[in-house]
A protein has these predicted regions:
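Extracellular glycan-recognition regions
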Residues: 1-100
Length: 100
């Protein structure tokens, strides 16, 4: 989640923040977010995330990483937002795909 007021990108697990990094939101600019979940040896999963503005190139490195010991539940991918000071949120070009 991008938190404009706190100037952070946060990764949550069941409504609990597990990782965060500094990120400055730019009003009126599109924010791109990429999240990837991959299996690791030993029945673990790594969750990685990165964020960038439409005026920037996508970062090569992941900005957040967190290891999870519980396999993700199957189901539908979702995106949600929480308006900042009543500012509307628009989600466009949401893409989800399986990485083998």
């Amino acid at each position: 989640m991008v938190s404009p007021g706190q100037k952070k990108l946060k990764l949550f697990r069941n409504d609990v923040p597990v990782r965060e990094v500094v990120h400055t939101w730019v009003p009126g600019d599109w924010t791109h977010i990429a999240v990837q979940i991959r299996p690791m040896p030993g029945l673990k999963w790594i969750v990685m995330a990165k964020v960038w503005h439409s005026s920037e190139l996508e970062p090569k490195e992941w900005q957040l990483a967190w290891t999870e010991n519980v396999e993700p539940l199957p189901g539908r991918a979702t995106a949600w937002g929480q308006p900042f000071s009543g500012t509307p949120i628009a989600v466009d070009d949401l893409r989800v795909w399986r990485i083998d």
